[in-house]
């Protein structure tokens, strides 16, 4: 009963770690966890896994649910990530953004966001006393108010990760979602806007412990 609900081709890592370059991002829906477990324990699946393993240099498998868990953000005490990235893409100087500017400015894109929230927000930006999940929600509300309509952005898929099944165990995420932008130009104009960098981004940085931002485009099959 699995269903491929999203498939994108990787174009660039805007916020990420060296060596984390991806060729494909697939969103696969299973009816239940039991269905997934039954599949991976099946002898035929185990037999064909050699083709998968022989083809991949690196991968992640992240279990997610659609509804927000009661214990959101995750209370798992796995320690802080070995290497963490809050989200400053240095829009006017970073090599990643220079490569971003070299690609077709008018092409529609998706941005995959992986977010791990802080236990408590940083003070000084109007989010004092909140947990990181509530702070990030305030950031999301501000983005919807200030940019969604003007930029033409939307969030077609949003999930709540439960666990990293394949990947470093210190990569623990609280949110995973895709944001659709009408063009690379629209995204860059937003993140370089002075109001975003001196307002909205401060809310994000105060709430986020670790993050990834991966530029993707719809895959043609």
Predicted regions and their residues:
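Flexible, disordered linker segments and immediate boundary regions flanking tandem C2H2 zinc-finger modules
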Residues: 49-53, 200-203
């Amino acid at each position: 009963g699995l269903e491929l609900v999203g498939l994108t081709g990787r174009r660039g890592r805007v916020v990420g770690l060296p060596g984390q370059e991806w060729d494909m991002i697939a969103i696969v829906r299973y009816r239940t966890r039991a269905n997934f477990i039954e599949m991976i324990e099946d002898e035929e699946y185990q037999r064909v896994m050699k083709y998968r393993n022989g083809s991949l240099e690196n991968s992640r498998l992240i279990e997610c649910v659609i509804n927000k868990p009661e214990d959101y953000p995750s209370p798992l005490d796995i320690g802080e990530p070995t290497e963490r990235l809050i989200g400053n893409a240095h829009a006017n100087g970073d090599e990643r953004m220079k490569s971003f500017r070299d690609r077709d400015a008018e092409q529609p894109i998706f941005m995959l966001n992986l977010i791990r929230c802080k236990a408590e927000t940083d003070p000084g930006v109007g989010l004092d006393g909140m947990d990181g999940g509530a702070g990030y929600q305030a950031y999301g509300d501000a983005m919807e108010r200030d940019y969604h309509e003007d930029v033409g952005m939307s969030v077609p898929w949003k999930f709540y990760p439960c666990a990293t099944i394949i990947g470093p165990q210190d990569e623990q995420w609280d949110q995973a979602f895709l944001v659709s932008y009408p063009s690379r130009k629209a995204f860059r104009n937003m993140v370089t806007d002075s109001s975003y960098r001196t307002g909205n981004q401060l809310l994000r940085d105060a709430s986020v412990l670790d993050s990834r931002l991966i530029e993707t485009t719809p895959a043609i099959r």
